[in-house]
Amino acid sequence: MELEAKTGYKFQNFDLLINAMTHSSYANEHRISYVGNNERLEFLGDAVLELTSSEFLFEKYSQMPEGELTKKRASIVCEPTLALCARELSLGEYLLLGKGEEATGGRRRDSIVSDAMEALIGAVYLDGGFANAKEFVQKFILNDIENKQLFYDSKTTLQEIVQGRYEEDVRYVLLKEEGPDHNKSFYMQALLGEKVLGEGCGHTKKAAEQQAAYCAIKKLKNDKGDLCI
């Protein structure tokens, strides 16, 4: 399967991969038993992700207090960050969705693709053990961690960057919206005065604003990794 090629992990029990990609809406429509959807695997994957990310942060930030480690872990395992990681694998393309979820843009919904990402971690764990699951998490979630942490609350981070340097706050402007009411896409712009800092798209205005802020932060980084405006 193409997804196996993307992840570099070959399933011994291919049914686990199918299970991980089966949304409850599809299982309900096709009268598949509860254990046939990905919710139980999501539960398991969540635990594997938390342990792996905790160990990673514990080793990477050896002098950091518990409270700060907890905040950093939250920024890694939160829905927006997992959805970002899922999109890097185009995970939404491989989901089995019910007709209703399909029609309302489920393949692009953060909650659905982030849950599928956790289910996939759970499937790798059951199929290949903790070592393989840990390697998967390190490769697709803990990579480029500094940028992914910025995504956790990009609007707050961006505001903190400009605070104290400028009298104006960052503001967000709706550029356009597309699609039917049940599946809209919003396009937002982050501005400082009249200067465009970044643009973003999402299924809600809030999500689009976060994306715009995230793009702005990445754009404001110079080659040395310092933030500058």
Predicted features, each with a name:
Residues 1-229:
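Double-stranded RNA-binding/processing signature
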